[in-house]
Curated annotation (Swiss-Prot):
One of its GO terms (cellular component) is large ribosomal subunit. The lineage of its organism: Bacteria, Bacillati, Bacillota, Bacilli, Bacillales. The gene is rplJ. GO terms for molecular function: large ribosomal subunit rRNA binding; structural constituent of ribosome. PROSITE patterns: RIBOSOMAL_L10 (PS01109). This is Large ribosomal subunit protein uL10. NCBIfam families: PRK00099.1-1 (NF000955). InterPro entries: Ribosomal_uL10, Ribosomal_uL10-like_sf, Ribosomal_uL10_bac, Ribosomal_uL10_bac_type, Ribosomal_uL10_CS_bac. Belongs to the universal ribosomal protein uL10 family.
Length: 166
């Protein structure tokens, strides 16, 4: 086999491994973005711990097949960039959905969450959710509220008894 075909097979294996290991993947059409805008997007994604790469559609198609992900073929037309995260489910969707609001040229094609293909609208919905840390802090705040209110009530009763005793 020629060296080029072997290199392409290795690239497909790398993409397939990336798709298998990612908890969240967003596929976008970046056509119409300037170099500065793409650089800004890459920077934002890097800060969020998201890997962003441009791949040939044929390679992504073969990698998805190898990774056992079905339903991507119809979205793999035109320029395709893939954003993946192995840690935070919300990060790729959040960064890309936010960036797409500011830059209409960026088109969200589809996404993959834990092996299932989701629509562009679902990607935007996931992008509007708080991050894992944000959800945990919200939960803790909700759990703390009754205890905090009880402490305030006990303190108020104590102060009221002190005033009446004086």
């Amino acid at each position: 086999m020629s060296a080029i075909i072997e290199a392409k097979k290795q690239q497909v294996d790398v993409i397939a491994e990336q798709l298998k290991n990612s908890v969240s993947t967003v596929i976008v059409d970046y056509r119409g973005l300037t170099v500065a805008e793409v650089t800004e997007l890459r920077s934002q994604l890097r800060e969020a711990g998201v890997e962003y790469k441009v791949y040939k559609n044929t390679m992504v198609r073969r990698a998805a097949e190898q990774a056992g992900i079905e339903g991507l073929d119809e979205f793999l037309t035109g320029p395709t960039a893939v954003a993946t995260s192995t840690e935070d489910v919300v990060a790729p969707a959040k960064v890309i959905a936010g960036f797409a609001k500011e830059h209409e040229a960026l088109e969200i094609k589809t996404g993959v969450m834990e092996g299932s293909v989701i629509s562009a609208e679902e990607v935007k919905t996931v992008g509007s959710l708080p991050s894992h840390d944000g959800l945990v802090s919200m939960l803790l705040s909700v759990l703390q509220a009754p205890v905090r209110n009880f402490a305030y009530a006990v303190k108020a009763v104590g102060e009221q008894k002190e005033e009446s005793a004086e």
